[in-house]
Regions:
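Hydrophobic anchor at the beta1->P-loop junction of P-loop NTPases
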Residues: 6
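Walker A/P-loop
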Residues: 15
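Switch/connector loops and helix/strand junctions flanking conserved nucleotide-binding motifs
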Residues: 104-111, 156
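Conserved AAA+ ATPase "sensor/coupling" helix adjacent to the nucleotide-binding pocket
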Residues: 110-118, 164
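Small-molecule kinase domains that catalyze NTP-dependent phosphoryl transfer to phosphate-bearing small molecules
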Residues: 117-160, 168
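Walker A (P-loop) phosphate-binding loop of P-loop NTPases
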Residues: 11
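Glycine-rich phosphate-binding loop used to anchor ATP phosphates in small-molecule kinases
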Residues: 53-94, 100
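Conserved substrate/cofactor phosphate-moiety recognition/catalytic segment
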Residues: 18-64
Length: 168
């Protein structure tokens, strides 16, 4: 199975693109799964001695749900952590990262616009996501597909991503 990870900071547009891809990509070849869909709750890990296993467990469950199809996995997984720290399920033969990276201003606006229960109500809550976005942008040449989707519609971004995936 091939693993195509669509990553970026919170507010980058990953879940929105996933919704479009699920309608566009051939379901006999690809399964699109968002971290939020695997049924694993971050708060069961936060502050525990196994916090670092959250991403591994989400990925393992997504692989199981994909049932042998190529997996388009929407997640905030940091590519550096994926290579250096994560346990990769044996079913994964290759991994490709697609990065969504709008401007910091767009990230800020999107996070501020979210409902209060999502937790982005203070500058302190938003700052780490802006910093992660800056790190991603600084490393833009390391990804096979890097998209600044600040000025693109959801459909335009999804089309670029789908065409790239279909060409793999």
């Amino acid at each position: 199975m091939r693993l195509i990870i669509i990553t970026g900071t919170c507010g980058a547009g990953k879940s929105t693109v996933r919704d479009h891809l699920a309608k566009r990509l051939d379901p006999d070849k690809f399964v699109c799964i968002d971290t939020d869909e695997v049924g694993i709750n971050w708060w069961d890990y936060a502050g525990t001695d196994h916090e670092e296993h959250f991403s591994d467990d989400c990925l393992a469950e997504a692989v199981r749900l994909a049932n042998g199809h190529d997996l388009v996995f929407v997640s905030c997984i940091n590519p550096q952590d994926y290579i250096g720290r994560h346990t990769i399920p044996a079913e994964i033969e290759s991994t490709v990262f697609i990065v969504l990276c709008p401007t910091d201003e767009v990230i800020y606006q999107r996070l501020q616009a979210r409902p209060a229960e999502r937790g982005f109500t203070t500058e302190e809550a938003i700052r780490p996501h802006i910093e992660y976005n800056q790190w991603i942008r600084k490393n833009r040449g390391k990804y096979p597909l890097f998209i600044d989707n600040s000025e693109q519609t959801e459909e335009q971004t999804a089309t670029k991503v789908a065409e790239f995936i279909e060409g793999l």
